[in-house]
Amino acid sequence: MVENVVYPAYFDADRSRSEGRRVPMDLAIEEPTVDEIAKAVQQVGYDAVIEREKTYSREFKPRGAVVVRGTEDTAKNDLVQAIAAYLGVIRE
């Protein structure tokens, strides 16, 4: 089973690409949480497990991570873009 780890920094509008943001600014949101990311992952159609003690390598404070399971047929970048699209809908 393939697992991808997704961090809140990937979607954070306050971060630059070099600081870890992986989506364009028009899809990025302010201070995303692992709960919002997990909801978006489920909307995309994958299983999500929240790991709150995880820390992204470019951050000092732990904000958690979401482990996405069952992504054998999807590239990580495509997955991140799909999650970002749903995060915008969740925030509205």
UniProtKB/Swiss-Prot annotation:
PANTHER family: SIGNAL RECOGNITION PARTICLE 19 KD PROTEIN (PTHR17453), SIGNAL RECOGNITION PARTICLE 19 KDA PROTEIN (PTHR17453:SF0). The keyword Ribonucleoprotein applies. GO terms for biological process: SRP-dependent cotranslational protein targeting to membrane, signal sequence recognition. Involved in targeting and insertion of nascent membrane proteins into the cytoplasmic membrane. Binds directly to 7S RNA and mediates binding of the 54 kDa subunit of the SRP. The lineage of its organism: Archaea, Methanobacteriati, Methanobacteriota, Stenosarchaea group, Halobacteria. InterPro entries: Signal_recog_particle_SRP19 (IPR002778), SRP19 (IPR053394), SRP19-like_sf (IPR036521), SRP19_arc-type (IPR022938). One of its GO terms (cellular component) is signal recognition particle. It comes from the Archaea. One of its GO terms (molecular function) is 7S RNA binding. This is Signal recognition particle 19 kDa protein. Belongs to the SRP19 family. Keywords: Cytoplasm, Ribonucleoprotein, RNA-binding, Signal recognition particle. Its main location: cytoplasm. Part of the signal recognition particle protein translocation system, which is composed of SRP and FtsY. Archaeal SRP consists of a 7S RNA molecule of 300 nucleotides and two protein subunits: SRP54 and SRP19. It is found in: Cytoplasm. Pfam families: SRP19.
